[in-house]
Structures are given as C-alpha cells and as structure tokens.
C-alpha cells in the first residue's frame, strides 16, 4: 500500500504511434472507454486518456497518449516521447506500407525516447481477414528479431486490445520493478555496498 498516493502504485505513460489511419485512436477508445466508431475524426494535437488497471495485486494508472493526426505532417517532436515508459507501434494489417513504415517509427523511438523504453508491435484491423496483406508470421518474425512483443488486434471487435495494453503494462512493471513509480514500497532488487558488482557480470541496462 502506497503512502504517497492511495490511488495507484504505478503511473505509466504510454504512447501510440504509427501511420495515419491505422487505428490508433480506435484502439485508445476501445481500451479506455470500450467504444468503437467507424467515423472517428482525426484531430490535430495530442490527446490522451487514462485508465487504471490491476496487475499482480498492484494498481497501475495508464496515461495513454495518441498522436491525434500529427503523424500526417511529421510534426511529432521529441517532447511527445519524453517521459514515456512504453510505446506501442501500430500498423494496419490491410496496408503493407504502414507495416513497411514501422522501421521508420522505430528509428523515431531510438532518436527521441529514453533508451530503455518498452516497445510493442501491434497489427490492427485483424477483423478484415479478406483484405489482410501483412502476414502474421512475417510480422512476428520481424518483432522477434527486434526482441519486442507482437500482437494482432481489432479495435472494431475488441480482439486482443485489452491484452495489448496489459502486455505493455506488464513489460514496463517487470522492468521498473525495483523503482516503483508512485510508491517507495519494497524494492524487489537492490544493489548496496555489501553486493559488489564485478566486471564480468555484464551490463544490465
């Protein structure tokens, strides 16, 4: 139980990035509000929603940011990435170009986000099976090469949407375990003066 803030144990900032039209806003609406609309209008600016979840007995507040159309103008700046704990890169399984552009989005992350930020690759619109052009295996192999989790989702019928955000939250929580975001309660791993770090242990950044 946190003494600093009774409402949550962790606060994670998540970003949704990817080409315009891949369904980022729809994923956000589905996860945060459990709603879906075909006619979601892209707004200019940055929008975010908050949802609190329970994970491993901890209360985690997710602050999820959506680019809200900025990617069309390539105006996403470093300030958008600053402080992000996790970034979800979204492509459209019916749009090969959006998948091809994942590499560019990952380069943006490398350029602007913190070095150890968690990443998740999401192929959205999996309900459009007859229009699908990006094979699951192809995307999975790519994600495996990068060492990041991968899921196919459908904001329309809610397939894997919950799982995508929960996967991301779990990945961040595992990484941040020792340094609880909103609580100074028990660090699970602590290196102190009685635990010398030898050179042959290898890096663990």
Curated annotation (Swiss-Prot):
Source taxon at top rank: Eukaryota
Disordered as annotated region, ranges? 183-205
Q: Any keyword Transport? A: yes
SUPFAM superfamilies in the record: P-loop containing nucleoside triphosphate hydrolases
Instruction: List the S-geranylgeranyl cysteine lipid attachment residues.
Output: 204-205
Q: Quick check: keyword Protein transport in the entry?
A: yes
Compositional bias, Polar residues, is annotated for 183-198
Q: Where along the chain is GTP bound?
A: 18-26, 36-43, 66-70, 124-127, 154-156
Function comment: Probably required for transit of protein from the ER through Golgi compartment.
Protein known as: Ras-related protein Rab-1A
Organism lineage: Eukaryota, Metazoa, Spiralia, Lophotrochozoa, Mollusca
């Amino acid at each position: 139980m946190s003494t600093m803030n009774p409402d949550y144990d962790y606060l994670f900032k998540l970003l949704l990035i990817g080409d315009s039209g891949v369904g980022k806003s729809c994923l956000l609406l589905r996860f945060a509000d459990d709603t879906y609309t075909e006619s979601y209008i892209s707004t200019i600016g940055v929008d975010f929603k908050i949802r609190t979840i329970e994970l491993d007995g901890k209360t985690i507040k997710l602050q999820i940011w959506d680019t809200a159309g900025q990617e069309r103008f390539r105006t996403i700046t470093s300030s958008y990435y600053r402080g992000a704990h996790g970034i979800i890169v979204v492509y459209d399984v019916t749009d090969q170009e959006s998948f091809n552009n994942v590499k560019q989005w990952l380069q943006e992350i490398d350029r602007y986000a913190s070095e150890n930020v968690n990443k998740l690759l999401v192929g959205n619109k999996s309900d459009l099976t007859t229009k699908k052009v990006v094979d699951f295996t192809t995307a999975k192999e790519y994600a495996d090469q990068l060492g990041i989790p991968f899921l196919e989702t459908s904001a329309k019928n809610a397939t894997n949407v919950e799982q995508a955000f929960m996967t991301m939250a779990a990945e961040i929580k595992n990484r941040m375990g020792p340094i609880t975001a909103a609580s100074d309660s028990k660090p699970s791993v602590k290196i102190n003066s009685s635990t010398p770090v030898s050179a042959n242990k290898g890096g663990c950044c």
